[in-house]
C-alpha cells in the first residue's frame, strides 16, 4: 500500500506546483535548448543563407517559475551577405497547461530582439520585455542539423 501512495505522490507532486496562479506581473529567467534541421545555400564564402525548423524545451531558474517546462517549435531563416548577418525566427511555445505563446525573434547588427506576438489562455494580452543571450556554439551532431541554447531574462505583465 505504501508503494502505491508513494507512486501517487511522485506522479501528482509536479502538478501541485502549477496549481498556483501566476503573479500578474514579475520577472522571468529561463534557459532554452533546441535541435533542428536546416537547408543551406552556400553561394560563396561571403554569401550564404539557410532556412530551418527546430524544437526544444525551456527550464526556468529557479524551477517552477513562469515558462518552466515549456516546449516549442520554431521556423526561420538566416543570411550572411558580405559579412552582414540577419535572421528571422517565429516560435510557438506550449506550457504544461496547454496555453500557448507566439514569439518573433530578429537578429541584426549582432543583437537579438524578441517580440511577443500573441498568446492563449493566461498569456492572452501579455506584455514582455527582456534580453536574449546566446549560449554556445555547440557542435552539430549530424550533418544538416544544429543544436543550441539561450538564456532569456526580463519582465512580464499578464492581462
Spans of features found by a protein language model:
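Sec/Tat signal peptide C-region and signal peptidase I cleavage site
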Residues: 15-19
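Beta-strand-enriched cores of mature, soluble protein domains
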Residues: 20-159
Amino acid at each position: 500500500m505504501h508503494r502505491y501512495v508513494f507512486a501517487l505522490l511522485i506522479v501528482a507532486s509536479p502538478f501541485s506546483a502549477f496549481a498556483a496562479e501566476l503573479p500578474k506581473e514579475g520577472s522571468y529567467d529561463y534557459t532554452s535548448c533546441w535541435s533542428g534541421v536546416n537547408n543551406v545555400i552556400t553561394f560563396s564564402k561571403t554569401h550564404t543563407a539557410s532556412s530551418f525548423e527546430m524544437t526544444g524545451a525551456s527550464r526556468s531558474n529557479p524551477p517552477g517559475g513562469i515558462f518552466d517546462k515549456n516546449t516549442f517549435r520554431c521556423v526561420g531563416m538566416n543570411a550572411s551577405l558580405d559579412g552582414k548577418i540577419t535572421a528571422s525566427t517565429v516560435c510557438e511555445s506550449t506550457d504544461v497547461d496547454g496555453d500557448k505563446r507566439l514569439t518573433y525573434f530578429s537578429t541584426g547588427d549582432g543583437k537579438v530582439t524578441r517580440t511577443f506576438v500573441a498568446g492563449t489562455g493566461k498569456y492572452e494580452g501579455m506584455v514582455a520585455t527582456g534580453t536574449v543571450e546566446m549560449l554556445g556554439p555547440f557542435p552539430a551532431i549530424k550533418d544538416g542539423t544544429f543544436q543550441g541554447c539561450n538564456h532569456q531574462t526580463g519582465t512580464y505583465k499578464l492581462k
